[in-house]
Amino acid sequence: MATTVTPEPLTALSRWYLYAIHGYFCEVMFTAAWEFVVNCNWKFPGVTSVWALFIYGTCILIVERMYLCLKDRCNVLLRCIIYTLWTYFWEFGTGFLLRQFNACPWDYSEFKYNFMGLITAEYAVPWFCASFIVERLVIRNTLRLRFDEVAESGQAEERLDRGGGGRGGRRGRGARAGATSANGYVKVD
């Protein structure tokens, strides 16, 4: 009798990595859009710093913990306000630390409502919207991901050839009904 293995949730490090890449990508896209809106630059040059990987990955991982603690206690509007306040605190703290080493990649000194050039009130609405998107799309879907033991596409195809999967068969080892598998990740519905 074969033993079935239930796909495991992603580790904190795996989730951190996904959050870091998400934040990094969004930073590049935001700066490209900003450059277009402000300077009408059709090249859409998006920029960021490698520090953004650590900053966004850690920030969103902490927001994930907040989400898990707050989801049954308060509505999404209040949660997003809390996330936005946290984002300001995190941006100020990491910016202040990086500035000590002349490594802070942003400077909001030209904004009217900035504080020490590290945070600016003008970004309250974008941070709030980003918080909503992070909770509703990124965190909730990342928490649904499971890592399947069969990660190599060749192994999965071999199982299909041997009748270990495919139509009517299991999708991944121990995968639940309604789950889909691709590249070793199982998304549980």
From Swiss-Prot:
Keywords: Membrane, Transmembrane, Transmembrane helix
Pfam families, per the entry: ABC_trans_CmpB (PF06541)
Keyword Repressor among UniProt keywords: no
InterPro entries listed in its UniProt record: CmpB_TMEM229
Protein topology in the membrane: Multi-pass membrane protein
Compartments, as annotated in UniProt: Membrane
Residue numbers on the Cytoplasmic membrane side: 1-17, 65-75, 136-189
Parts of the chain that traverse the membrane: 18-38, 44-64, 76-96, 115-135
GO cellular component terms listed in the entry, alphabetical order: membrane
Stretches in topological domain Extracellular: 39-43, 97-114
Predominant location category: membrane
Family to which this protein belongs: Belongs to the TMEM229 family.
Protein name in UniProt: Transmembrane protein 229b
